[in-house]
Amino acid sequence: MRNDVLTLTNPMEEKELEQILGGGNGVLKTISHECNMNTWQFLFTCC
């Protein structure tokens, strides 16, 4: 169990931090990043 705790508390690497904060190669790719607002409005208001 001690090893599990140590694994969970390991600090992030610089590359991981840059990716999360939007530095380096850019932001994380997500569905909402790829789509525009009109698509989401249609999906949530169509019913």
From Swiss-Prot:
Pfam short name (any one): L_biotic_typeA
Family: Belongs to the type A lantibiotic family.
Span of the signal peptide: 1-23
Per UniProt, location of the Lanthionine (Ser-Cys) cross-link in this chain: S32-C46
Chain positions found as 2,3-didehydrobutyrine: T30, T39
Record-level GO BP terms: defense response to Gram-positive bacterium; killing of cells of another organism; positive regulation of biosynthetic process of antibacterial peptides active against Gram-positive bacteria
Induction field: By trypsin.
Cell compartment(s), UniProt: Secreted
Main location: secreted
GO CC list: extracellular region
Keywords: Antibiotic, Antimicrobial, Bacteriocin, Lantibiotic, Secreted, Signal, Thioether bond
Keyword Cell wall biogenesis/degradation part of the UniProt annotation: no
Function as written in the Swiss-Prot or TrEMBL entry: Lanthionine-containing peptide antibiotic (lantibiotic) active on Gram-positive bacteria. The bactericidal activity of lantibiotics is based on depolarization of energized bacterial cytoplasmic membranes, initiated by the formation of aqueous transmembrane pores. Ruminococcin A is a broad spectrum bacteriocin exhibiting activity against a wide range of pathogenic clostridia and B.longum.
Record cross-link Beta-methyllanthionine (Thr-Cys), residues: T30-C35, T45-C47
Full protein name: Ruminococcin-A
GO MF term set: signaling receptor binding
UniProt PTM: Maturation of lantibiotics involves the enzymatic conversion of Thr, and Ser into dehydrated AA and the formation of thioether bonds with cysteine. This is followed by membrane translocation and cleavage of the modified precursor. It is not established whether the 2,3-didehydrobutyrine is the E- or Z-isomer.
